[in-house]
C-alpha cells in the first residue's frame, strides 16, 4: 500500500490518512511534495509490545525530495497512530489498522 506524504495541492496531510492493511503487508510512505516529511509512530497509540522506535523514522531524518520513500511492515494486529513530526501541529496525522 502506498501512502502519500502531502496532497497534490500542497496540503500537509497523509493520503490516505486512515487505512487498513493485512498483517505483514508493506506500507510505502512516499513524499509527494517538496516539503520535508517523516513518519513517526506514537508510542502511546500502538499495540502493546510494539517498539515505536523500531517502526518509526528517526525524528531527525526527513524525506526531503518528491519520490523519496520510507517502507515499514507491521505484523502485530491492532491500531497504530502516526504523524509527521515537523507538521504534527498542522494536523499531519494518520491511523492504520492491521488486521
Curated annotation (Swiss-Prot):
It is found in: Plastid, Chloroplast thylakoid membrane. SUPFAM superfamilies: Cupredoxins (SSF49503). Cu cation binds at residues 37, 84, 87, 92. Keywords: Chloroplast, Copper, Electron transport, Membrane, Metal-binding, Plastid, Thylakoid, Transport. It is a peripheral membrane protein. It comes from the Eukaryota. Pfam families: Copper-bind. Residues 1-99 form the Plastocyanin-like domain. One of its GO terms (cellular component) is chloroplast thylakoid membrane. InterPro entries: BlueCu_1, BlueCu_1_BS, Copper_blue_Plastocyanin, Cupredoxin, Plastocyanin. Its cofactor is Cu(2+). Participates in electron transfer between P700 and the cytochrome b6-f complex in photosystem I. Belongs to the plastocyanin family. This is Plastocyanin. It comes from Phaseolus vulgaris.
Amino acid at each position: 500500500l502506498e501512502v502519500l506524504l502531502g496532497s497534490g495541492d500542497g496540503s500537509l496531510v497523509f493520503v490516505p490518512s486512515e487505512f487498513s492493511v493485512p498483517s505483514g503487508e508493506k506500507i510505502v510512505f512516499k513524499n509527494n511534495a517538496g516539503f520535508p516529511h517523516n513518519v513517526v509512530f506514537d508510542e502511546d497509540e500502538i499495540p502493546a509490545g510494539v517498539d515505536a522506535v523500531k517502526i518509526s523514522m528517526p525524528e531527525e531524518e526527513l524525506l526531503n525530495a518528491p519520490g523519496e520513500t520510507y517502507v515499514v511492515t507491521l505484523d502485530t494486529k491492532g491500531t497504530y497512530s502516526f504523524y509527521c513530526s515537523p507538521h504534527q501541529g498542522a494536523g499531519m496525522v494518520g491511523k492504520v489498522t492491521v488486521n
